[in-house]
């Protein structure tokens, strides 16, 4: 955005569209999206400038990531130096929309802001070393960083006059989809984990303190409800489960029966269930690793292979998230596979915590609504989450396996990865 930006949003004309009025403020016609991965060179440059990936991770909560804002800004500066020089303000989508709604230049919150490789997670402010490594004079182009409980401003007259909003309505600073979802799922305090079982599996939770992943696979963000939160993605999610199911020509009913008919621990038969390169941990496998009987290793034991796949996924998930120092009281499962009680039972057994399915839909929007009601109206967030973020009735699954059931399997799993 150029230097016309502040005056533009403060003087929006209801007779004109937002796009017509804001377009002249843009210093680039297109913006990269979250799937862009063209900035590998810039990631290396940023890491080298500050002393390596581990330093970037310890400072920002993540290693330098291609789709994160910092590397994208560096590429913009390198490829379009003139446009960069004309840029007076750089916003995330969340803070940009918040600014438009308020009619003032809004801050970036610690939740969405931590996904930039620019924010120091120990101070929750811009990190001078990372800014310098990214682009010149970047600090003057960035808005302030603010916690999620910050009032960004009041509703702009544009929206009052054009759409009938109540004048003086306070606007709570916007955040990203994952931090907002954490609140909307009722998991904004430590002790509650959320595991989303989808094409990729995602694990996120409120953290009791601020600590970065020493392996550089996970991410740390600001928790909009206060403190910090973690997020970690696992590429080999539902697609891996489907690969094993299809390998034996099973349907989902037979898949479930296989889990029910095999014991926790799978009699020592273990699978590293990576059918494609994984990011947690970062390994370039194209096929699973199997350890056990000859029949099992040659894919002749269908039921054991199915249990090994699901157990391997949750064992890997627990191993990769131990750095978060969590003591889960409950795991909230969401996503398509969460409906499967047999899969949920494996999660309960591996993590030694009760599992519940969430009945929440639209958790991102719900989280935003709960935050606004808590911050602006003074309503108790815990009470509202208890009312609006209830688990499905009768969905609680308690662990059945003994607490040490997966100790040996976890060690073997790690050994298989080291030997690959």
Provide a role label for each language-model segment.
Residues 107-111:
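A short, surface-exposed helix-loop junction/capping segment
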Residues 34-35, 147, 232, 335:
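Small/polar loops that bind or transfer phosphate-bearing groups
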Residues 1, 338-339:
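Gly/Ser/Thr-rich loops at beta-strand to alpha-helix junctions
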Residues 144, 332-333:
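A generic structural signal for short
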């Amino acid at each position: 955005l150029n230097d016309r930006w502040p005056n533009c949003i403060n003087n929006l004309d209801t007779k004109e569209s937002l796009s017509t009025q804001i377009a002249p403020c843009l210093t680039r016609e297109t913006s990269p999206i979250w799937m862009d991965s063209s900035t590998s060179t810039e990631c290396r440059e940023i890491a080298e400038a500050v002393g390596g990936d581990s330093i970037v991770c310890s400072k920002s909560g993540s290693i330098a990531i291609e789709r994160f804002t910092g590397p994208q800004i560096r590429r913009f500066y390198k490829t379009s130096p003139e446009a960069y020089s004309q840029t007076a303000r750089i916003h995330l989508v969340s803070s940009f929309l918040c600014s438009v709604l308020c009619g003032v230049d809004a801050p970036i919150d610690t939740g969405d802001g931590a996904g930039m490789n620019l924010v120091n997670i120990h101070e929750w402010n811009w990190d001078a070393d990372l800014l310098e490594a990214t682009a010149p004079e970047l600090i003057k182009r960035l808005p302030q960083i603010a916690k999620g409980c910050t009032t960004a401003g009041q509703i702009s007259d544009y929206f009052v006059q054009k759409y009938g909003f109540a004048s003086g309505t306070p606007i709570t600073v916007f955040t990203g989809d994952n931090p907002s979802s954490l609140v909307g799922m009722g998991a904004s305090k430590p002790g509650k984990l959320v595991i989303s079982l989808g094409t990729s599996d995602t694990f996120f939770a409120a953290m009791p303190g601020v600590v970065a992943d020493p392996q550089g696979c996970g991410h740390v963000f600001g928790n909009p409800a206060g403190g910090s939160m973690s997020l970690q993605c696992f590429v080999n999610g539902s697609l891996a489960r489907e690969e094993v199911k299809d390998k034996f020509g099973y349907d989902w009913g037979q898949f479930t029966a296989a889990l029910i008919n095999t014991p926790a621990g799978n009699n020592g038969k273990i699978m590293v269930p990576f059918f494609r390169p994984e990011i947690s941990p970062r390994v370039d496998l194209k096929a699973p690793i199997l350890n056990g009987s000859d029949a099992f290793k040659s894919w002749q034991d269908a039921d054991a292979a199915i249990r090994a796949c699901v157990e391997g996924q949750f064992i890997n998930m627990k191993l990769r998230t131990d750095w978060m120092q969590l003591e889960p009281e409950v795991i909230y499962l969401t996503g398509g596979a969460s409906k499967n009680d047999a899969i949920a039972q494996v999660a309960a057994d591996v993590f030694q915590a009760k599992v519940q399915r969430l009945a929440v839909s639209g958790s991102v929007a719900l989280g935003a609504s709960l935050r606004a009601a808590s911050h602006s109206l003074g309503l108790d967030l815990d009470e509202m989450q208890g009312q609006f973020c209830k688990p499905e009735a009768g969905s609680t699954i308690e662990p059945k396996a003994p607490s040490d059931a997966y100790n040996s399997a976890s060690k073997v799993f790690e050994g298989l990865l080291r030997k690959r």
